[in-house]
């Protein structure tokens, strides 16, 4: 259905439900504890993001770097081709500062708040001895969310909303990826044939299903991050291209401004000269 009729409607509905879910957790959970954690977590991230980015565990082998930093870097690098193209497509016509605000800053802050709300609530319940959230996470990460929601009122409703959100997040990501692959295979056309789009969506789902059935979630994750390393070199080239593109755009805008200022200056000089000539003619007459 495309961006306007399909992805946009589904994404907006997804965001609304996620927002309601977040507010639900903040209000019914330990509100003050969540906001304190949000401030502290954000500050801790800003203080340590560079340090941990260069941390190689040379003196203490805990596998934390491999299981978190390296894994998620490779994970997001493998997602970057279609995510970047999709964001670029929906951001067409936006200013650079609007793009940075809407794609980097606001989503990052919302992510901090989301993790502080749900993670903070889980930690609070664990520390108060109400329930063993940590044990539930170690036993089965996929069901730990529902163990957390059971500690709050309307657990059946909130658990149902959680399942719906998981489905919507997956469908939104899959739909966006299929849309980008469809655009690439059609030579960059914005409106490719619907049948081709359906084919790529089904193919994407079939590949994911085969990997899940054949090797479980780990096989699917391995297949996703395998493309991370080779595409990292492509990203370096893309970063350089972006740098050159921004410089060329700046030079072009600077040239246009200089030409406009020059024309304005010349026009002002002509008006002054014409005014002086007119005054001289009046004096002579």
Identify the function of each model-found stretch.
Residues 256-285:
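Long, low-complexity, intrinsically disordered cytosolic termini of multi-pass membrane proteins
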Residues 96-102, 187-200:
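Membrane-interface alpha-helices at helix entry/exit sites of multi-pass transporters
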Residues 1-94, 101, 106-159, 167:
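Membrane-embedded translocation segments of transport machinery
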Residues 124-128, 246-258:
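Short, Lys/Arg-enriched, Gly/Pro-containing loop segments at transmembrane-helix junctions
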Residues 10, 104, 178-184:
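Re-entrant/interfacial helical elements at transmembrane boundaries that shape
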Residues 25-34, 116, 206-215, 269-276:
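Hydrophobic alpha-helical transmembrane segments in multi-pass integral membrane proteins
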Residues 18-29, 110-120, 161-179, 200-204, ...:
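Hydrophobic alpha-helical segments of multi-pass membrane transport proteins
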Residues 211-226:
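Extracellular/periplasmic helix-loop-helix junctions in multi-pass membrane proteins
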